């Protein structure tokens, strides 16, 4: 496979790596290994929470995971639907520390987004009120912006300032 033949060169020459967590498990494991070997930041996005739950040990190896509020509820087996952003931040910090995940960004739809780190740091960014025409690709664009900022030295608290 390309990853077996050229994975070292690909990862070594990358500034960071973005991975879909629910890809083939062997591929995700190889990507995690190569990122650790070459000291590269690894960002994960989740599409299938059932697979993510099965791979919690792998998720601990990611520098940052991004999901929405419903996905975070599934990931931690809790109902976060009727909870304020502030309360969610405190709860997620506890969950992050127990799970040994590094950091998590949770999108909250029209309310905005929040981040939590396992060191207790957290932040909230209120969404700008705009007229939405189409949300296609919004989550991917958000994820890309976060990953690029963190790749080039921005801290989550700076990105949320």
Language-model region placement:
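Conserved beta-alpha-beta core of the PfkB/ribokinase-like small-molecule kinase fold
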Residues: 15-90, 111-113
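Structural alpha-helical scaffold elements that stabilize or flank donor/cofactor-binding regions
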Residues: 9-10, 57-58, 97
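Surface-exposed charge patches
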Residues: 9, 33, 94
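Conserved phosphate-binding/catalytic region of the ribokinase-like
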Residues: 51, 78-161
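Conserved phosphate-binding/catalytic loop of the ribokinase/pfkB sugar-kinase fold
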Residues: 1-16, 21
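Domain-wide signal for the mature, well-folded portions of proteins, strongly enriched
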Residues: 1, 34-36, 42, 63, ...
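Short glycine/proline-enriched coil/turn segments at helix->beta-strand junctions
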Residues: 12-13, 39, 61, 100-102, ...
